[in-house]
Amino acid sequence: MGAPGITGRTRPTKVKKQASQQKRKRDDVDVEKLEQAVTELDPKTGTYNDFSDLPLSDPTKQGLKACHFAVMTDIQRKAVPLALKGHDILGAAKTGSGKTLSFIIPVLENLYRLQHVGADAGLGALILSPTRELAIQIFDVLCKIGKHGHMFAAGLLIGGKSLESERQALPRMNILVATPGRMLQHLSQTAAFLVDDLKMLVLDEADRILDMGFQRDVDAIIDYLPKERQTLLFSATQSKKVSDLARLSLQDPEYVSVHAEDKSATPKSLQQNYIICPLEEKLDTLWSFIQASKKSKILVFFSSAKAVRFVYESFRHMQPGIPLLHIHGRQKQGARLDTTAKFSSAKNSCLFATDVAARGLDFPAVDFVIQVDCPDDVDTYIHRVGRTARYNREGRGVLFLAPSEEEGMLKRLEAKKVPVEAINVRQKKRQSIKEQLQNMCFQDPALKYLGQKAFMTYVKSVYLQKDKEVFQLKEYDLEAFAASLGLPGTPRIKFLKDDNSKQKKQASRQTIEVSDSDEEEAPKAEKPVRTKYDRMFERKNQDVLAEHYKKLVRDGDEEISAPANDFSGEATTNGADDDFLAIKRRIPADDEDEDFGGEASVAPGGRVVHLAGASQPLIIDSNRREKLLQSKKKLTKLMDRGKKLVYDDDGNPHEVYELETEADFKAKGLPEHQRQKFIEAAREVVQTADVEDKATARAKRKEKLRKRKERERGEAEDDGDEAVELEDTGENPLANFLADAQYTDDEQEEVEQPKKKEKKWFQSDSEDEEKSSKKKRKKAKQQVVEEPETLEDMEALAAGLLG
C-alpha cells in the first residue's frame, strides 16, 4: 500500500486537481440520484408544501435558503413538479403569487441534470419578457438563486446597451433573459449565435408577449428555435387561444390555474374602489388625493407618456410635499433603472407611470394604485392594480371613471370576477388647481406645448380604442378638459376634423343628382407642365418653429386660413394645414414698396404688435422677435425719427433748418443786398462778442496778478518767522557743535557692521570688483550732478563726464 495521495508516479498528485476529480465524481452521482428521484416524482398525487420536499440539487437548495424561500406558494406547488418532469405548462395566478420562482427553479434544475454547462454546450434556456424592467428583475432573481454553486453562464439581453459587446459574449451563454426585439436582432444579425440545442423556452407575461404588439417578433423568434423543447407560459391573465398555442408548438400542455375557482381574480387583501369623475375634475381629484396621502407610497397610471410628463412637470412646480418620480417608455434605460430603484427603496413617494410599469415589476410596500385613465381592458386593470397587495400584504386600488365609462367598464369587471366598490369624494377636501395650471402654461410655453400634446394623445388613445361601448369620444367634454389642463383653447385634432369632412362629403354625395348617362362628360383640363424654375419660385420660407408647434401654441380655436394669393398672384386651393412649410412673409416682385405690416402677411402662429411712435406694426412670428420686445435699444431703431423744433419770440414752433420758398426769397430783395445784410449782421455779432471776450481776458489777468502777490507776501512772512534770535548764555556754540559731532562719530564706530554675505561656489572676485566699480561710477555721477562753484569742482565735473 502506498502512502495516501500517492499514485503510480513518483510525484504526488496535486491537491487541487484531486479535489476537482472527486467533485466531478460526486456531481455524476448526484445527477443520477436526481434523475431517479424526478422519475419517481408524482405531481398529481403527491403533496409538496416545502421546497425541501422536491428533488432539487444542492446549489439550488443553498440559493433558496440564502434568499429565505422555504414554503411554496400555490402556483409553485402545482407548477414546479410538472416542470421538473418536463411537461409544457400554461400557468395562471394572481399578481404577487410567486410566478417567477415557478420557472426559475425548473430552468436551473433541468439544465443541471442535463449537465448543460460551458461554452461548448450552447444556449440551453431562453426567458422572454415584454419589458426591460421585468427582464432585469427576472435576471436578478436568477442570479440570487443560482450563484451558490451553479456553473451556468447567464446573460441579459435588452435594448439600450452596446450591441457589439453582447455579440461577443452570446456564444458562451447557457441561459438568456431577453426582450423579444433585442433577441430577434441578435438571431438575425449575430452569425456565431446558435440556438439549435435549446432545451427550454419560458414566456413571462405570456398574454402580453403573444398579443399584436409582439406578434411578429415572437413568430420570427420561434422560427429559429428547435421544435423539440419544453415551453413554459406564465401570466396573471393566461391566454387559451388555440392559435396562440399552435404558434408555440406546445405538446400536451398542462394548464395550471390556482385561483380559477376563487370569487375574485385579484388578491383578497386588495381593496378596490372607483370614483365617478368627469375629465375636467381628474387632475383636481388627483392633486387632492396626493395632498391627503403624503405619508404613503403611491403609483399613478396614465394612458400616454405625454400625460405622464405633463402631470409630473406641473405637479413638481407646485411642490405637493412628497417626492415625485415618473417613468415611461420614451426614457433612456439608465433613467428608467434609476427611477425604479428610487421608488423601490423609498418609503413615501409618488410615481407617475404608463403601462410600462404595469406588468411584473415588484415594487415593495405600495399603498395605493391610482388609475387616472381608464384601462384598455380588464386584463390591463388586473396587472395595474397588481402592483400593490403583493405577498398577502394589504393594498388599495382606485379607478377614475368618466360618467360615460361607468356602465360598460363595471360590466366587464364583473364578468372577470373583479369586485369594485364605488366611493365619493368630499367636495370640501377637493382643491382646484385650474388657475395654477393656467398661470404656469402662460409663463412657460414648453409646459403649454406639453399639455396640448397630452390632450391630443389622450383623445387619440380614446379614439383608437376597440371597445366603443366603454370609450365613447362624443360623450367627453373636450373643451372643459382642455381648460382643466390650463390650456387657453382646445387644440385642433386632425383626425376628428377628417372624420367630419368625410361625413359631410358622404352627405353631399347622397344629395347630388346623377346626370344622364347619355351626356358626354366634360373633358378634363390637362395640368400644366411645371419646371424646376416654377418650383423654385413657389418655395416657401422655413419658419423658426416647427409647424405643429405653432399650430398648438397659438391661442384660440380659429382655423388658420391659407394666404389669399400665392407668389404669382393666383388664388391657392390648399389650406394651411395641408402645406408642409408655411409662408412666413411673401413679397410679390411687382409690389416691393407696398406695406406688408398688416395681418395678411402674418404667418400661422404669429401676431402683430403696434408700437407707440412707430408707423409700421411689428410682426411677432419667432422667439427672436418675441425677445426684441424686451430690448429698448432695439425698439428705438424701429421708432420714427424725432424732429427738433425751435420756438420764436411769439411762441410759434419752427424746425431748426427751414427752407424758404422761392416767393419768400424774392420778397427780401436781390441776392447781393441780402448777402451784404448778412455780412453786416455777422460783423456786428463778432464785434459784440469781441468786446465781451476782451473784458473776460482782462479780468483773468488781474485775478492772476492778485493771486501771485498774495503768494509772495505769504512766503516773506514765513521767512521772518524762521529767523529766531539765539539766547546769550556765555557758551561757545561752535565748540559744543564740534564736541557733539565727535561723540556721534565714536558711537558709529562702536556699532558692529553687518557681516558681508558669503560667496557662493560659482561666484568669483571679479564680480565684487565689478560691483565696486559700478558704485564708484554711480557716486561720481551723483557728484557730477551737483552744481560746480570752484575750479576744482569744474575739473571734477569734466573728469566725470569724460570717464
Swiss-Prot record:
Biased segments, Basic residues type: 697-710
Extent of motif DEAD box: 204-207
Any GO BP annotation: rRNA processing
Location of the Helicase C-terminal domain: 269-441
Known EC number: 3.6.4.13
Major subcellular location class: nucleus
Catalysed reaction equations from the record: ATP + H2O = ADP + phosphate + H(+)
Listed Pfam families: CTE_SPB4, DEAD, Helicase_C
Coiled coil segments of this chain: none
Extent of Basic and acidic residues compositional bias: 522-531
Motif mapping: Q motif: 49-77
Function: ATP-dependent RNA helicase required for ribosome biogenesis. Involved in the release of U14 snoRNA in pre-ribosomal complexes. Required for pre-rRNA cleavage at site A2.
UniProt subunit comment: Interacts with the U3 and U14 snoRNAs. Associates with pre-ribosomal complexes.
Protein name: ATP-dependent RNA helicase DBP4
Natural source organism: Phaeosphaeria nodorum (strain SN15 / ATCC MYA-4574 / FGSC 10173) (Glume blotch fungus)
Gene responsible for this protein: DBP4
